[in-house]
Amino acid sequence: MEKHNEHKTLNHKSSKEKDQITNRLKRIEGQVRGIQNMVENDRYCVDILVQISAVQAAMKNVALHLLEDHAHHCVADAIKSGDGEQAISELLDVFKKFTKS
């Protein structure tokens, strides 16, 4: 199946929105570095696992935000332009990937 190419960017996002996503990812990156330090410093396993869970939740929130935005903008635009079936199929494929994790 050919992917929907004309909607592959975040061009519809404002600079502020992109900055918010980038800042969230930078915070998550810092959390991951903190976990790495915890491992290197032989911290208690449960404490490390709690932090890993927090990172997973933060990543899931970023992904859900992007997924929602994709549905509202990219998929909606594709439907309006008559290419909705392919965009919906692609969206469903992404949902399947999320439910596997």
Swiss-Prot record:
Question: Family assignment?
Answer: Belongs to the CsoR family.
Miscellaneous information on this protein: Can also bind other divalent metal ions (zinc, cobalt and nickel), but these metals are poor regulators of DNA binding.
Self-association state and partner proteins as the record states: Homotetramer. Binds DNA with a stoichiometry of 2 tetramers per DNA.
- Major subcellular location class: cytoplasm
GO MF:
DNA-binding transcription repressor activity; metal ion binding; transcription cis-regulatory region binding
Q: Where located?
A: Cytoplasm
Q: Which UniProt keywords apply?
A: Copper, Cytoplasm, DNA-binding, Metal-binding, Repressor, Transcription, Transcription regulation
Q: Name one GO cellular component term.
A: cytoplasm
Which positions in this protein are listed as binding Cu cation?
A: 45, 70, 74
Protein name, per record: Copper-sensing transcriptional repressor CsoR
Q: What happens when the gene is disrupted?
A: Cells lacking this gene display a slightly enhanced ability to grow into medium containing high levels of copper.
What organism, scientifically named, is this protein from?
Bacillus subtilis (strain 168)
Query: Source organism lineage?
Result: Bacteria, Bacillati, Bacillota, Bacilli, Bacillales
